[in-house]
């Protein structure tokens, strides 16, 4: 951490085909062991599969899925007087999108199926429709925040 001032926030780059930052964020989160070309391959194949399934623009499906999964509020563990409380905190847009992408990928990895392309495309389509594991995770987080609203003053 710098003592001289605040570090500038890096702007997310866009991917070569769709020219979209969300796709690039997705690629960087799906990445394992530095194999970025494989990550791009998985994402682009999943987008093609979404195109075939829904017959709509896959980017709009991705945006809709991420918008549906993005949480407005989350809980953070805070230790006060020897006991740990789950304190609800508001989440910014960038952090919310990052969480949504993480939840979408986690839900797709847990899905039964043949390969990651199939699982990711299915999860994105489900999330865009308002169902699926990632949506359930968001609702669970919101429920937790609502249940612990009494501790909101600990922020």
Curated annotation (Swiss-Prot):
Bilayer-spanning residue ranges: none
Protein's UniProt keywords contain Oxidoreductase: no
Subcellular location: Plastid, Chloroplast
One Pfam family this sequence matches: Ribosomal_S7
Matching PROSITE patterns: RIBOSOMAL_S7
Any one Gene Ontology cellular component term annotated for this protein: small ribosomal subunit
Molecular function terms from GO: rRNA binding; structural constituent of ribosome
Keyword vocabulary terms for this entry: Chloroplast, Plastid, Ribonucleoprotein, Ribosomal protein, RNA-binding, rRNA-binding
Function: One of the primary rRNA binding proteins, it binds directly to 16S rRNA where it nucleates assembly of the head domain of the 30S subunit.
PANTHER family per record: RIBOSOMAL PROTEIN S7
Subunit relationships: Part of the 30S ribosomal subunit.
Stated name of the protein: Small ribosomal subunit protein uS7cz/uS7cy
Organism: Morus indica
């Amino acid at each position: 951490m710098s003592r001289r001032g605040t570090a500038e926030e890096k702007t997310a780059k866009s991917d070569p085909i769709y020219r979209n930052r969300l796709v690039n964020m997705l690629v960087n989160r799906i990445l394992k062991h530095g194999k970025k070309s494989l990550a791009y391959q998985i994402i682009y194949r999943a987008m093609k599969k979404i195109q075939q399934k829904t017959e709509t623009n896959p980017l709009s499906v991705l945006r809709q899925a991420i918008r549906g999964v993005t949480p407005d509020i989350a809980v953070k563990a805070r230790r006060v007087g020897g006991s740990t409380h789950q304190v609800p905190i508001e989440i910014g847009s960038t952090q919310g999108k990052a969480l949504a992408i993480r939840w979408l990928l986690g839900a797709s990895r847990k899905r039964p199926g043949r390969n990651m392309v199939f699982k990711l495309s299915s999860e994105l389509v489900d999330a865009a429709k308002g169902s699926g594991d990632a949506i359930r995770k968001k609702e669970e987080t919101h429920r937790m925040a609502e249940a612990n609203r009494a501790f909101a003053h600990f922020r």
